From Swiss-Prot:
Positions contributing to L-serine binding: T252, A253, E254, E306, T406
Chain's gene name: serS
PROSITE patterns: AA_TRNA_LIGASE_II
Compartments where located: Cytoplasm
The protein, known as: Serine--tRNA ligase
Keyword set includes ATP-binding: yes
Binding site residues for ATP: R283, K284, E285, V299, E370, V371, V372, S373
């Protein structure tokens, strides 16, 4: 939610930012907000003036009663003032509702470094890491997508897609999951289950070392938390509601972590608050018909380890760089080649002022795919959830800034590991950093093994 003071003092900045985002229909909202706000403030001023007048009359009534003088005329006048105040208060309340309707539906103000664009095609790669394995048939596309800034090894054999590897390795059952739950669900099996859990513990351990407090949040939250954390459109496209309850299944641990300190004034000395949340995530994926229908890349349910930061406003941009670097370090240790992308205005979403994605190179698919998103939401969520801080009790509270980043979404990390660490025969080598968590160094095709996890 935007600060009404920003709109009052710099409406052109807000209009220009909406233009950058391609939200042309909402530009006219700013003039409407200013008009409503002027009416609201004028009526508040009138209310305060009437209250002052009523107080003066009350004092005069007291004086007259002491003297035994008549007060009927003053009492009648006081009653008229009370009626007028009550009427104005209703008008003020209605005006506030109208203003809030607009404020709650305006996107965050973008950072100057966010590239202007219309879609994901306009996102800007800013750095690359790792040595990619590239099938010769994908080489031209890889060179274009990597801008010639990545090392690579050309493969004469064609790498398999993760969905085919899962079948070869006995790692998932999609047919039975579809029977039980429908599309975009899965049973994970055998070593892939161990790999999923290993990724969670690996990411958790790495972030605890960096000072993050581990949290298993509630998997369901009330509507006010979702309204405070995300946009209203997500209620239709992303979020599952529990029928008959004021509860929603979380699409990410970000949301319960954002709501954790709702309606609180934090002690400034405790900032930044660093949390690492571990949870399942539930998503409708309503707007993705036809995309990634096979496999585990885009599914209704998955596990995720999430970084969440409450920071001082003046420190949030530094923390944004830190949390994306934290995620990069995880993927470097998993030996996954990737690029970091600065998300453009048209693909940014409403909540973030700036967002980075990590896109892992997927040899089977022959393209980079998103595995991490890291956002600085500045005070957009904090205003909606009323999360403030102060350094002294006599100081006016200020809104915190909130930031979030994927550490690891296990399903997508598994896709990246399978496609990047596969051998020609379908064997998948486990990244060395995970050995102590998995207890095995590779996963071999079903036809080559007797049972799960045998040495």
């Amino acid at each position: 939610m935007l600060d009404i003071k920003l709109i009052r003092e710099n409406p052109e900045l807000v209009k220009n930012d909406l233009k950058k985002r391609g939200e042309l229909e909402k530009i006219k909202w700013i003039d409407e907000i200013l008009k409503l706000d002027a009416e609201w403030r004028a009526k508040l001023k009138e209310i305060n003036k009437l209250r002052h007048e009523r107080n003066k009359i009350a004092i005069e009534i007291g004086k007259r009663r002491k003297k035994g003088e008549p007060v009927e005329e003053l009492l009648a006048k006081s009653k008229e003032i009370v009626k007028r105040i009550e009427s104005l208060e209703k008008e003020v309340e209605e005006l506030k509702k109208k203003i809030d309707y607009y404020l709650w539906r305006l996107p965050n103000i973008t950072h100057p470094s966010v590239p202007i664009g219309e879609s994901e095609e306009d996102n800007v790669p800013i750095r690359f890491w790792g040595k990619a394995r590239v099938w010769e048939g994908h080489l031209e596309r890889f060179l274009e997508q990597s801008q010639g800034k990545m090392e690579y090894e050309v493969l004469e054999w064609r790498p398999k897609l993760h969905v085919d590897l899962l079948e070869i390795l006995g790692g998932a059952d999609f047919a039975r999951a579809a029977k039980v739950s429908g599309s975009r669900f899965y049973y994970l099996l055998n070593e892939i289950v161990i790999l999923d859990l290993a990724l969670i513990r690996f990411a958790l351990d790495e972030l605890i070392k960096k000072g993050f407090t581990p949290v298993i949040p509630p998997y369901m939250v009330r509507r006010f938390v979702e309204e405070g954390s995300t946009t209203f459109e997500d209620f239709e496209d992303v979020i599952y509601k529990v029928e008959g309850e004021d509860l929603y299944l979380i699409p990410t641990a970000e949301h319960p972590l954002a709501g954790m300190h709702a309606n609180e004034i934090l002690d400034g000395k405790d900032l930044p608050l660093l949390y690492v949340g571990i949870s399942p995530c539930f998503r409708k994926e309503a707007g993705t018909a036809g995309k990634d229908t096979k496999g585990i890349f885009r599914v209704h349910q998955f596990h995720k380890v999430e970084q969440f930061v409450y920071s001082r406003p003046e420190e949030s941009w530094e923390w944004h760089e830190r949390i994306i670097r934290n995620a990069e370090e995880l993927f470097q240790k998993l030996e996954i080649p990737y690029r970091v992308v600065n998300i453009c205005t048209g693909d940014l979403g409403y909540v973030a002022a700036k967002k980075y994605d990590i896109e892992a190179w997927m040899p089977g698919q022959g393209r980079f795919r998103e595995v991490v998103s890291a956002s600085n939401c500045t005070d957009w969520q904090a205003r909606r959830l009323n999360i403030r801080f102060r350094d002294r009790t006599d100081e006016k509270p200020r809104y915190v800034h909130t930031l979030n980043s994927t550490a690891i979404a296990t399903s997508r990390a598994i896709v990246a590991i399978l496609e990047n660490h596969q051998e020609e025969d379908g064997t998948v080598k486990i990244p060395k950093v995970l050995w102590k968590y998995t207890g095995f160094k590779e996963i071999v095709p079903v036809e080559k093994k007797e049972r799960c996890c045998s040495s």
